[in-house]
């Protein structure tokens, strides 16, 4: 019955979404391309130095965001401050020697960053493994609901290092009843592999890299290998002495020297009854670590609800980026215009729409611009532990992350499609704009687990992570497909991600402001909460 009521409310709201007959429609009209352009160009400006946390440029960026939150009329998170300080431990790792894999046939010598990467969250200046025994643990998964335990039966795991396959057993499958088929589950994320290894008490975990399974090439693994960040209270979360990656061809040779074929093992490891086994091989590696304790702020403002409630709706758009990187045509500054200056502009403009309402929504509206998303959404992890309003009373979170300025779109691509009834609500709201919802066609890469909404999801809060992406209104689907491929190859996390005042088309971003204001407005005024799909892996986390 609740589903019918909510869809009815969404339909009634959608009927008026393109008119001017209610206060929300009038409030929406304050949104403008000019504001979005001004915000984006300021946050992606060279003076912000790529917004790497702890830099002078980052200080300028968060200061600007706080000023704009105040100008919009948002209430500060603490006293008169819009900053929520997040205690961070920054670590830098250098591996001064090759990793050595001793097999029955040879010793493989791997150069750091080329054949392997290694790090540890342990606060120790030096970590050395000498001839630690290796074992093959399939996908490194313990999933009782699928009858799978890739660590079952291994003796003395505390002395050994697990070699595991990236992603999960559903990769490439059309059977959605088993690990969601080709749609990655959290079991497929690298973060989970290290977490599970720590729970099993192993000495280390080495993930076998493969582009499609990881969702990115080796260059991304290599780029993040030198430095890591942790929320200080969480610094032992991945507490194996060794967390690392090895190139696929290295793993292929290692296993061949032990009498196994990697492709056959991948097929075997997909089965529920797969059992791990020891390899007649060892690993030796040395890591030298330096640490620094610092603080970096989340920027948070909110609009108090009119219903005297501690319930809330949360909008997300992270402010941090990468600073400097490998130069392209002499430019090494990674401005982060599409990742994620546009999302902060989107969030600020939605805030302006809410402030333009003659009466505040029933629920509180929180606008959270977290720090350290690029290093594991640390700011959001901290926020869910220290929230402005109780996490169990957050109706939903709405997140935008990575949005190229290509103009209007017909689609609304939902990453994490099928997890909750937010999908059907959004479908109704999108229709008056001539838009339709669709699942992310690249869900195998686990993008749902790779942005700031995910710490909320882990606490049982439904999330909407969506945007126009696959069907450009002016140029069509094939053009969009070509642009997406070009974006990942030439712009994402590169100095080319900057504003282009003469050609940037903000009309698509304005679409997202209007649509997701509509969604937030409905969530902020309805009774009850969105519902998880009973088949979602997060359906039973939070009961309410």
What is the predicted function of each stretch?
Residues 15-17:
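C-terminal motif of bacterial Sec signal peptides marking the signal peptidase cleavage site
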Residues 30-48, 53-76, 100-104, 160-187, ...:
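Catalytic-core environment of secreted peptidases
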Residues 115, 126-127, 232-233, 238-261, ...:
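Metal-dependent peptidase/peptidase-like ectodomains
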Residues 352, 356, 468-543:
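His/Asp/Glu-rich mid-to-C-terminal helical/loop segments that flank catalytic regions of hydrolases
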Residues 182, 186-188, 213, 323, ...:
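Acidic/histidine-rich catalytic neighborhood of metal-dependent amide-processing enzymes
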Residues 23-30, 46-56, 97, 121-125, ...:
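Second-shell loop/turn segments in exported
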Residues 24, 102-107, 117-154, 235-336, ...:
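Soluble metallo-hydrolase cores and metallopeptidase-like ectodomains found primarily
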Residues 49-175:
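Noncatalytic luminal/extracellular "stalk/propeptide" segments of secretory-pathway proteins
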């Amino acid at each position: 019955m609740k589903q019918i009521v909510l869809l009815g409310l969404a339909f009634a709201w959608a009927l008026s979404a393109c008119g001017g007959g209610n206060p929300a429609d009038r409030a929406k009209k304050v949104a403008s391309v000019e504001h979005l352009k001004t915000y984006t160009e300021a946050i992606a400006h060279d003076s912000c130095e790529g917004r790497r946390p702890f830099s002078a440029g980052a200080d300028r960026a968060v200061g600007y965001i706080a000023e704009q939150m105040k100008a919009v009329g948002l209430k500060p998170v603490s006293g008169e401050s819009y900053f929520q300080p997040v205690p961070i431990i920054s670590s830098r790792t250098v591996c001064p020697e090759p990793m050595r894999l001793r097999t029955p046939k040879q010793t493989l010598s791997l150069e750091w960053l080329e054949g392997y990467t290694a790090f540890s969250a342990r606060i120790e200046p030096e970590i050395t493994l000498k001839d630690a025994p290796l074992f093959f643990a399939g996908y490194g998964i313990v999933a009782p609901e699928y009858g799978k335990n890739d660590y079952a039966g291994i003796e003395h795991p505390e002395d050994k290092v697990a070699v595991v396959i990236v992603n999960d057993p559903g990769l490439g499958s059309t059977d959605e009843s088993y690990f969601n088929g080709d749609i990655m589950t959290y079991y497929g994320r690298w973060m989970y592999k290290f977490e599970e290894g720590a729970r099993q008490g192993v000495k280390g975990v080495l993930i076998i890299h493969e582009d499609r399974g990881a969702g990115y090439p080796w260059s991304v693994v290599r780029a993040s290998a030198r430095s890591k960040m942790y929320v200080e209270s969480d610094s032992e979360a991945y507490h194996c002495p060794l967390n690392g990656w090895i190139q696929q061809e290295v793993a292929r040779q290692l296993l061949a020297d032990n009498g196994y074929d990697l492709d056959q093992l991948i097929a075997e490891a997909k089965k529920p009854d797969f059992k791990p086994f020891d390899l007649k091989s060892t690993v030796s590696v040395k890591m030298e670590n330096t640490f620094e304790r610092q603080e970096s702020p989340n920027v948070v403002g909110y609009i108090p609800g009119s219903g005297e409630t501690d319930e809330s709706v949360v909008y997300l758009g992270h402010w941090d980026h990468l600073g400097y990187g490998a130069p392209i045509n002499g430019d090494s500054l990674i401005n982060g215009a599409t990742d994620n200056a546009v999302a902060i502009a989107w969030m600020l403009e939605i805030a302006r729409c809410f402030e333009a309402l003659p009466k505040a929504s029933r629920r509180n509206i929180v606008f959270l611009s977290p720090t350290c998303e690029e290093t594991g959404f640390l700011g959001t992890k901290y926020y869910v532990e220290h929230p402005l309003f109780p996490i169990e009373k957050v109706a939903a979170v709405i997140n935008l992350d990575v949005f190229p300025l290509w103009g209007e779109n017909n689609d609304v691509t939902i990453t994490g499609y099928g997890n909750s009834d937010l999908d059907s609500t959004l479908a109704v709201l999108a229709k008056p704009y001539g838009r339709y919802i669709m699942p992310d066609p690249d869900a195998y890469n686990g993008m749902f687990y790779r942005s700031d909404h995910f710490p909320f999801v882990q606490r049982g809060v439904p999330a909407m992570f969506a945007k126009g992406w696959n069907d450009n209104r002016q140029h069509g689907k094939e053009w969009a497909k070509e642009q997406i491929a070009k974006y990942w190859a030439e712009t994402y996390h590169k100095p080319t991600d900057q504003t282009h005042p003469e050609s940037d088309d903000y009309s698509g971003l304005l679409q997202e402001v209007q649509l997701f204001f509509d969604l937030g407005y409905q969530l902020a005024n309805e009774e009850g909460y969105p519902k998880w799909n009973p088949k979602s892996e997060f359906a039973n986390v939070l009961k309410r």
